[in-house]
Amino acid sequence: MRARPVLLAVISLLVAVAPAHAATKRLTLRAGPFNVNGFQTVWPTATVHNTGLNGYITKMDAELVDARGRRVLINKVMLHHVVFIDNARHYNSCPGRKGTPFFGTGEENEKLVLPAGYGYRTHKHDSWRMVAMFMSHHLQAKTVYLQYHVTIVTGRRMTDVLPMWLRADGCKVEPAYDVNGDGDPAQHNLQTTAWRMPVTGRIVAAGGHLHGGAYDLRVTQPRCGDRTIVNNAPRYGAPSDLVYHVFPVLHEPGPVATGWQLSKTGIPVRKGELLNVTGDYDQSEPHGRVMAITHLYVARDNRAPAGCEPLPSDIRTVWTRARGRSLPPRVTIPISRLSSSGKVVSVDRPPGDDVVTSAPDTVVSSALGGFGPANLSIPDGASVTWAFTDALAHNVSLASGPRGIYSPNFHGGSYTHQFTVPGTYKVFCYLHPLTMNQVVTVRP
């Protein structure tokens, strides 16, 4: 009778140590279809397929494709950004938000890659969702799918990573901020937020999301002299790159790549310590609705040193683009109209006579048909109130001018901006860019 527990214990031990059959699989999954009308910007959200497997994700990427699986070029529909969120996990850098963001990409074509031995733990019954932004640069409506590839390792244990989405502008509801453009060419706009680490461990991978005008995105460690431990530098396309030749221009083109940092050894961080995340943008010109978000992947390790040892020698940066420009190019966003032949053309000003006023505040009727008056001259210090008079969503966005003007999207209501710097301001609604554009001349 005494032998039985021993025998059962031996059997249990053998089962526990028996190696499972390890396998690596690359899955191709899709979300959609998503219908995008001509020159439309949409923000789709959807429940998406997970891997259907128990294992560890080691690689992931995403792109827009058509029904036959062919890549959709950005001169048709642009994937501005997408974030995949794991509803089964409950860590979020911003309290109160549901789920854990674990992969994101956009114009920079970021690809998730983890060092050997590390993976993001996933289960076959986990629930995933996506939030995204697509921008049409074509007159014709198009149906697109978000296709994503996931490499998953099953049948063996790996070191799990905790994804952390850390923004330079903190946990505001709106993940973007504006750079006003009131500096000289040598000045930078620095936006920094300190984030407290929830675990002790090692940063083994880090990516980043930036917009046009960005110089840098970095994470520094104050307890070690504020040294830089993560750098997600941008890489911009050559002047001939397609990103600079799509019309209408709905926003300032962003980087075509950002540096993805890897280290199998990992950079030690301690639970409770602060890390500073800084977005570094050009300050000499306005840049609207910019983002600076670093994506950290932290492996828990209670043995991670508490000192300030030299950074690991195996830190390296990989790029999805081999070549490009490191400094942000100057880009002027034109206002555009649809010609009589059905082509998108850049114009200096919309149709209509100048309306000259000395009033302290001018109300502009704003609807799908356009801004009225479309050409307005006001004195320095005066305000303009755009009154949105139809049921559609609209906004006011600077195309070019001395200072930034960037409203939220409105369904009705109004938006007021006071002009305090003389000059010529070209504005448009990026949701309806071919009909809703305006020139405001501010007189000294």
Pin down the residues of each PLM region.
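Bacterial N-terminal signal peptides that target proteins for export
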Residues: 1-7
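Bacterial N-terminal signal peptides
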Residues: 8-16
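Sec/Tat signal peptide C-region and signal peptidase I cleavage site
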Residues: 18-22
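Beta-strand-centric surfaces of beta-sandwich/beta-rich domains
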Residues: 23-202, 207-342
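Extracytoplasmic copper-binding redox domains, predominantly the cupredoxin/blue-copper superfamily
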Residues: 341-444
